């Protein structure tokens, strides 16, 4: 009856309609996957053992009634704050009892299902703990553990760095810590409102203690910003300590589960021992010892950046799974009259919108793992360092420097990439992507702060760009540089490299393309830098002039890193059965990256205009190839429906049924009249018009 | 005392600190503007009369207690829905009493301050009304007006097009309207769950009537999708009519003020007269007359698109104002030791992040006005059309076609641009951009649905691209084409044009650059199209193969349109005093657009690699120039603090004071213990550990 044949689909002689077909279509799609999905999961997780552990933890979370997320998207700020507190309490028990690696896995999984809880825990275990461990002595760390910081008993720490007037520029913080020699105390003070500590996660409701960043002032001399532990609330009744004012920062774009607050200190006295003294020391007489390298002090800040690269993969995989599953069951428009409508995944344009993002999400994982491992190795070295081991110290210092710049670029571009994935996958789901119950809106609002906190992405990128130029300068002087920029050494051979008819599907050639592009940008910027210095500018001024170039350098260098790490991980770790499917993704990622930035390759002369056509054809080709196994690729992420938490992205593909059901469960059919019917709607809609009450004038 | 000199600033011999300086800095910045801001406002508003009217309406809104937005960002879904209803009721009174132009102005202004209210009104006055006026006869229109549709008395209309399973593909909708000759009625029915009307704004709480898109079936023959008016609720008690089921769609990413619902029809009988019969007619005997051109039926859909281009400007100007004002008072990092920290607006990189967006927001206005005028002219022609005026009909049909494709591309790229403006300006404000009280989060969540509804942006773009290829095909056959693509006529002269040493600051050259780029893309795609047709594909199939090219074509063509319209409006309307400031913006916009898409111009050979360096230098140069007068450019938008609704973006620049105050007003200092202290926090944080209760075994 319907000439557009939109309603009915025949599969193996059986008829389905728009409502009943999706799960059948999903089963068909799933059957297309030719590679062993389970093996892909092991590859992604770094081995079967990890997969099994993840699955165990996922089950524990899902079964716990406290982690039921059925009404997650309908909670208001007050409700989500309380629930988050309960979840934090529950999770802290695991921290006490379980091995560190399991805890990390659990947190990472929670981070997919409930970003607020993840962060509220992170405020204490990541930021507070990290600062005390990273900048306190072993004795100090032990002291705060003995007070309850280890298992959150009579203790909850927060991290007071940012002020209303200062964020990125730590050196500009204005809170003061003046040493009072008479009493052997520091006096912590907020000089004016713009120096109020601001945004402090955990401060508004939870924290009993905080690490404070404040200017150390001894005998009138300002030693710059150092870290101190300050007690905020009295133990047991949770009232504020004398001299502490705290307010609630209230509504945020997202992450309402975290109780961000502001803190003002009014001449709060703390014992001298509360200065965290691993690097900076003040003795009873007010003698001050400064650290050998400022960056060591902030080493703990790297932790967050490294884990954000990994979070970007975790959250990205959730949303690319939803959009690709939906694309496999959603039909819209028929391209051939009389034929059923086309699945949107079969539109070449839709493939181009989503499949490069799938490849990107895979790529993020490889690089995050690589940098994560580098980070762990460096931290171990740092912990093992003997106080008088000069050579060892130098090595650690240079590793930390490398980590700083690598993690800066990676944090920035991964968190942006993930934001982009959430945004683009939402749009790829049309109107249903805008439903609260499919999770995109909430996740975007929660996610994007990752681009701002723990190092604003733009500032990180600029500083990564600065480090790249510094490396090039070092190389020119014959000094050693870190691994991440070692390709710059071969720069002279690369500078004028061209494709020259070589294959654009050869990983080596693709990596080379990116090395040429990155190398040229960095070296051109370095030329300019040296010229500016020659003209008498100081380093800061010269870098300022080159900010746009620094951004570009960091961008292209980081993309190179992602591409190289992807190919290299396939090379070293992928079994035969999954090698080709992984290569297809990696090639798609590298080629699409070139297409997106084609001006770069044309400009550098590595490619000619006709090569860009080839790149486009290849992107199309790999889209077509990857499209066939999208369900395999996304199933390999191994997220259960609990973690997906979006009815249109359910495993079984029965999207309309789950979605309709979800909407109705959360909004049970009640009175067709809204709650404000009597108060507002009725008096308006069913009003009687009043006559204009004009007094008649006797004008005759 | 502070070697970084971050805290204090000296201005005219007087010292200010981080907290007190901002308003002084703002006054200084404001004084820099060299052009007459008021004249710029007139230019933007299209004349002094419009400005005065806008100001009058703004004052009326601001003073109305019902429109007080002090706690806007803290309202939950239930509260915002009720408030929105009250505001809709209030605004409907203006619709009754005021001239159409004033109403439009009022709605547009409301759209800046409260997008939900704007849309909830729009559901009736835009969508329902538009459909009845556009596809009903004059008698039918009059009938529904007489029922109360004109002033929302005992009448509230909604618009039921989309179904759970179908959105963009109107032709695939599955709701049926079967003509029952016996009773002279249509029977409206929802055949299965996926055919449930979905997303219908106003359905859940408010609507008494709806326009339904349903398949017209007469004597077993399916005539495709037509529009019908159906009553949903009984008048006076607001209960559901027999056969109507309605549910609440609940939580959305944003726009919670609108009561979107789903509707199922179970054999609902409506009189034959409820088919909207301007184009499609069914008589008593079941004879069906079809319209001359399907597109005329959907002509009313263009209204929304045209106004969305204008909305993009309206909302974009609010957020670019906030970010630029903040950038003028926020200091972070000192570039020269001992000097005060730098205002972030003075970082070249920050200028590049924001100033091209400022130019973009200006550009949107020029094009939106131009297309708006074209639209009004066409609608007038359409209304004046005599039934037997063949020539007139042809002209209108060709105008409507042109409007369809122009408005499609413009709607897509403007709404995306505005989303980008909100997102990037938020990031430019660092952490404070994430505060609920600065409005970015709410606005983004509310805004982005504009990219999806009333024509999904991607689909619109593809269809605009299709129209461009069709125009090129027509041109090749010597047929006439619309104004918007007339530059394709000169294509042969342009195809191989190069910059050839001409100035990149000559508007003519810049417009030519974009015409060459757009022309080449369109013509290459047209070559491919003709080749595919030659190979035996039908048009749909050929267009499918060329989807990526269609997207590119629409993108570049639309950018050309924005650039050309900007220069031309300056040329024809700007007085001397504001000409240069406007040109600076337009040049920045055109040059930055080239830089962003440099691959395009290199590929087409219009520019050479060294020209790209010139473009970059010029972008830098115009950023520096425009930077000096940013406060003037943004003040010219003439939005009061009420419409800005972001303390960090206030007119007086006293950002920290307003922000601190706002946060504390909305979150008054109460108990330092959270509401869930007794229930959740205390039992956890102050728990006594239980001993592990292990039964001792007598194992000896
Ligand atoms: C939800 C949330 C939770 C947070 N939790 C905590 C917490 O628990 N503890 C804590 O201490 N902090 C916390 N923060 C603060 C966060 O770390 C800062 O917001 C972040 O570091 C950015 O600093 P800022 O906001 O001061 O931005 P700014 O440094 O003021 O930057 C503003 C803008 O200017 C640009 N800019 C600045 N300097 C330069 C330059 N030199 N060159 C070019 N551009 C420049 C930036 O890119 C940015 O766009 C939180 C923030 C948020 C939003
Ligand atoms: C908040 C809200 C309010 C709304 N209010 C109303 C209302 O009052 N009345 C009403 O009738 N509707 C309403 N809508 C529905 C809205 O108009 C539709 O969601 C919109 O038209 C998109 O249709 P869809 O969701 O079915 O997406 P689909 O058409 O299913 O598209 C899904 C995805 O597939 C892609 N795609 C589809 N076809 C193709 C193709 N041929 N080629 C390439 N890609 C393709 C699209 O780009 C999109 O990314 C509302 C929606 C929302 C979110």
UniProtKB/Swiss-Prot annotation, chains A, B:
What does the record give as EC number? 1.3.3.6
Where is the protein situated, by its record's location annotation?
Peroxisome
Q: Name one GO cellular component term.
A: peroxisome
Which biological pathway?
Lipid metabolism; peroxisomal fatty acid beta-oxidation
Its cofactor is: FAD
The family database entries (Pfam families) matched by this protein are listed as: ACOX (PF01756), ACOX_C_alpha1 (PF22924), Acyl-CoA_dh_M (PF02770), Acyl-CoA_ox_N (PF14749)
Keyword Lipid metabolism attached: yes
| Record GO biological process | fatty acid beta-oxidation using acyl-CoA oxidase
Molecular function per GO = acyl-CoA oxidase activity; FAD binding; fatty acid binding; flavin adenine dinucleotide binding
**Function of this protein?**
Oxidizes strain chain acyl-CoAs with a chain length of 10 to 14 carbons. Also active toward the 2S isomers of acyl-CoA-esters containing a 2-methyl group.
Family, per entry: Belongs to the acyl-CoA oxidase family.
**Protein name in the entry:** Acyl-coenzyme A oxidase 2
